[in-house]
UniProtKB/Swiss-Prot annotation:
Disulfide-bonded cysteines: none
Name of the molecule in the record: Dephospho-CoA kinase
Pathway stated in the Swiss-Prot or TrEMBL entry: Cofactor biosynthesis; coenzyme A biosynthesis; CoA from (R)-pantothenate: step 5/5
BP terms from Gene Ontology: coenzyme A biosynthetic process
Localization of this protein: Cytoplasm
């Protein structure tokens, strides 16, 4: 039996670090962000729907969607954010299910669905167990500002657009505290995976 694991966390909590550690173990990790990027590429149904919804102002000169422009629109407008999610989420969900089912058919021991907005999108039913990657509020803010070159105000706004990390950790089967060293994070992950093997 394949154990389907949901991997989630707050923005800039280090979820990608944990996902890469799982990949190094030879575990299939299905990344919702990568699938979401592919879903809005030219020629995909969601691409056309986004232009119909948001207009051609959000396009770059080569016709690709300007992620920064679209991001700025949806992070400050709840209705626009919901409209975008209504277009992108169904396409992403279907592709994730296809890939999950493929891993199950291949009798893999584990398959991981890496979904940043697992709880917000109410996708818990797609997985058997949930790991939340957590970090202190101070570290989260610092990492996000540095990684995305954001002002403190912009970073706080992005963090607030998601479910609070404390709420996510309360709903997890396991929590990895990623406030320390990589070795400490890896040790926690190894313990979890060994207990589920």
């Amino acid at each position: 039996m394949t154990l389907v694991i949901g991997l989630t966390g707050g923005i800039a909590s280090g979820k990608s670090t944990v996902a890469n550690m799982l990949i190094e173990k030879g575990i299939t990790v299905i990344d919702a962000d990568i699938i979401a990027k592919q879903a809005v590429e030219k020629g995909m149904p969601a691409y056309r729907q986004i232009i119909d919804e948001f207009g051609e102002d959000i396009l770059l000169s080569n016709g690709d969607i300007d992620r920064k422009k679209l991001g700025a629109l949806v992070f400050t407008n709840e209705q626009k954010r919901l409209a975008l999610n209504a277009i992108v989420h169904p396409a992403v969900r279907q592709e994730m299910l296809n890939r999950r089912d493929e891993a199950v058919a291949n009798r893999e021991a584990f398959v991981v669905l890496d979904i940043p907005l697992l709880f917000e999108s109410k996708l818990e039913s797609l997985v058997d167990k949930i790991i939340v990657v957590s970090v202190t509020k101070e570290l989260q803010l610092e990492r996000l500002m540095k990684r995305n070159q954001l002002t403190e105000e912009e970073a706080v706004s992005r963090i607030r657009s998601q479910m609070p990390l404390e709420e996510k950790t309360a709903r997890a089967d396991q929590v990895i505290d990623n406030s320390g060293t990589l070795e400490e994070t890896k040790r926690q992950l190894d313990e979890i995976m060994n207990s589920w093997a």
